[in-house]
Amino acid sequence: MNLPERSRFVIYAVGIFVCYFLYGIVQEKLTRGRYGEEVQTDGSVGERFTYALALVWVQCLCNYVFAKVLLTIRPQKEDTTNAGSYVACSLTYLLAMVSTNMAMRWVPYPTAVVGKSAKPIPVMILGVLIGRKSYSWTRYACVLTIVLGVILFMYKEGKVSNLPAETTLLGEVLLFLSLSMDGLTGAVQERIRAASAPSGQQMMRAMNFWSTLMLGVAMVFTGEAKEFMYFTIRHPEAWTHLSLIAVCGVLGQFFIFLMVASFGPLACSVVTTTRKFFTVLCSVLLFGNVLIARQWLGAVLVFAALFVDMLYGKKAPLATAKKPPVEGKLSEEKKLNS
């Protein structure tokens, strides 16, 4: 059954929201909980899970297996995408993730809020410059309004940074690197979509295959693979949390790649950026927390921009609409001449 485009968009977006909401809860239990009864050097009881590379590696491996099984059960036409494109996409994706995790420890709170919320901007800019994508002016305005609205909604007064200037500068450089890598990932995905139009499952399988290999090599060289293995032997109960994270992450990434394959990386970036906004807004509505005027303004901006984008944002410029037939004609002429 072929669902209308807007229905599919809503289903994918809700799937991303729900899966990563549960993912965040379980991840916090894993990374902030303690395992065992041993007394540590700082006097605390129990070990913490500190294996960031291993956590992402387990996730990527499970994502790859899930996509591989889906494609085995329901085979699709061959994916003709160049392997180098997937390698580049996987590398920029992993660099963005690592840079973000490191930057958030070394940037002041306001910078962190802006950095987390501004992801659609480099995705849009580099999608135009490298991915050869074109957007209407309405979509540019809507995306910028959504980013501004999320920043206004999520920002909290009274958080003061005590970080030294050198550390802050390093964090800002890492944050810029993270946003640049996000933009490059989106641009490469746009090129892949334009060149070979793989399905969401095919993109998920290929990107997670290369990500698993890269992370595996990094874990071996850093020694984290051995430390992670010993930790899980000492505390096998950690596998319960890891398994739950894997399930939530697999389903969440499945919806993400369906979104990227059907609507492009910019639409996916907007959905993942507004995810935290909708999570906080739901908690406000459910538990009766009070919003201040600035947060109400941010909420109005986000909803207004999403509504306008839904109505008008997908109308491409005239030049873009005429481009595919021209390219098709040129390729036909090349075939005839050859």
Swiss-Prot record:
Subcellular location: Endoplasmic reticulum membrane
Topological relation to the membrane, as annotated: Multi-pass membrane protein
GO CC terms, sorted: endoplasmic reticulum membrane; Golgi membrane
Keyword Transport: yes
A Pfam family this chain is assigned to: UAA
Segments crossing the lipid bilayer: 9-29, 53-73, 84-104, 111-131, 135-155, 168-188, 213-233, 244-264, 284-304
SUPFAM superfamilies: Multidrug resistance efflux transporter EmrE (SSF103481)
Designated name of the protein: Solute carrier family 35 member B1 homolog
Source taxonomy: Eukaryota, Metazoa, Ecdysozoa, Arthropoda, Hexapoda
